[in-house]
Amino acid sequence: WAVIFDMRRGTMGVVEYRGYSVLMSVYHKEKPEYLKQAIESIQTQTLSTNDFVLVCDGPLNESLDSVIAAKQQEMGKTLNVVRLAKNGGLGNALNEGIKYCKNELVARMDSDDIAYPDRCEKQIAVFNTHSEVSICSGIVEEFTTDPNTVDTKRVPPETNAEIVEFAKKRNPFNHPCVMYKKSAVEAVGSYQDFYLLEDYYLWLRMLMAGYQGYNIQEPLLHMRAGSDMYLRRAGWKYAKTQARLFKFMRDSGFIGNSQYIKSCVIRSGSALAPNWLRKFMFEKVLRK
């Protein structure tokens, strides 16, 4: 697939982006009503997309396929459905999907979240006024059942300097509402296998390669977190993955040995703690 750069030259020779792609992955356990809401939140954007890539990560079910078929009727060629033969996980699905994205700017979207109507317009404005930015996210509002009832807000650091410093300890971008330059993501090897941390690993490689980020200090997305999210961030496998990520940072010179040890102790302690304690840490410490 050839990449179609939907942009024009503005004043002073600065590139102005107009079009953007949307990249979403869905698998068989997703609820059809959530997928419908997620897609419709993109359909109602104040700045419309001309390229929506929906990756089906393995065979789905009749209910999900019905939602997709209805949306294909509504959206026509704008909705490009990519079906993978088997479920390979989020990172693999996004790697396949990004190949089909026709625009330089790609907006990530999860299949159970709800974007604010002006989310993409605000992000496009950042790229048009800050040519140095290659990745942009913003505030997400987590909810359990009603998007108007906010459980908590995830507020990422704003400037690139703050992002780099924050990344030494925690994920500096909210992946569900990230928009990035396709060329920058592909230049560092795109998403790679890293259990539950594929996005964090990608951001680190981008930052280390000199690509800059920015986080809009306004809500861009309603994120369906659920009250049991802390349960998915547990166990030896997750603890070892986190330790491997911080080892990568240390070995790359991104952090020192003291920060490596501190991060491993804190993160492993959280992953291996009893559920009640991890829930407290997740809600009161790690999400703040």
Label the predicted regions:
Residues K29-T44, N50:
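Short, well-formed alpha-helical segments that are part of the catalytic scaffolds
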Residues L84-C101, K122:
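Glycine-rich, basic loop-to-helix element that forms the pyrophosphate-binding segment
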Residues V106:
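Short aromatic/hydrophobic "clamp" motif used to bind/position activated sugar donors
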Residues D118-D151:
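Conserved donor NDP-sugar-binding/catalytic core segment of glycosyltransferases
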Residues I139, G213-L220:
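Catalytic beta-strand/loop signature of glycosyltransferases that borders the donor
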Residues I139, K153-N171:
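Short, flexible, basic/aromatic active-site loop/helix in glycosyltransferases
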Residues Y195-L204:
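Acidic donor-binding loop at a coil-to-helix junction in glycosyltransferase catalytic cores
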Residues M223, L231-G256:
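Catalytic core of nucleotide-sugar-dependent glycosyltransferases
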